[in-house]
Design a protein with these regions (language model features):
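C-terminal catalytic "cap/lid" subdomain
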Residues: 1-171
């Protein structure tokens, strides 16, 4: 690849959360990482009928659950929005990015209700749900704009980018 990185794609469904299937996903993730590859996880839309029935795919929660299964330190959700704003940035020019969320409060959930992404169907509310899953699993989560891959460098250099949801309430 252009960056000399190997990736492996995992196509999963919500049924990975069943106890008898978790171990298979954990083993696959561990093996991918042992081989020095980067796991790329997505919902398997070809077999997931829930998406058709609900008219909404939900990769954010799936990613959070996989992060918990993998005992990850951090989950990065890349979107076309910079992170969580104090109000919908598509409607309000004065919307301000919230850089750190130490606790997911009802106010945070209410703010997220109106700030959707134009990519995918989950919007910000599903990203907050994913942040809750991560927090319960002891994992930090960052929501950031993924249109520029150089943004990842800021994460790796511990520079602020997007919105950081902390697992333990500390930065």
């Amino acid at each position: 690849s252009e960056y000399s990185l190997n990736v492996a794609q995992l196509l999963l469904t919500k049924y990975i959360l069943l106890e008898d299937r978790k171990i298979n996903v954990q083993n696959a993730l561990n093996r991918i990482i042992e081989l020095g590859s980067i796991p790329i996880v997505n919902e398997n839309d070809t077999v997931s009928i829930d998406e058709l029935e609900l008219e909404m795919g939900e990769n954010d929660s799936l990613a959070a659950n996989v992060a918990v299964l993998a005992n990850a330190d951090l989950l990065i959700i890349m979107s076309d929005i910079e992170g969580l704003f104090d109000k919908d940035p598509h409607k309000y020019d004065d919307a301000e990015l919230i850089p750190v969320v130490p606790e997911i409060t009802e106010e945070i959930k209410a703010i997220a209700g109106g700030a959707g992404s134009s990519l995918g169907t989950g919007g910000m509310a599903t990203k907050i749900k994913a942040a809750e899953i991560c927090k319960n699993g002891g994992i930090d989560l960052i929501i950031m704009n993924g249109r520029d891959p150089r943004h990842l460098y800021k994460v790796f250099e511990n520079k602020p980018i997007g919105t950081l949801f902390t697992a333990n309430g500390e930065v």
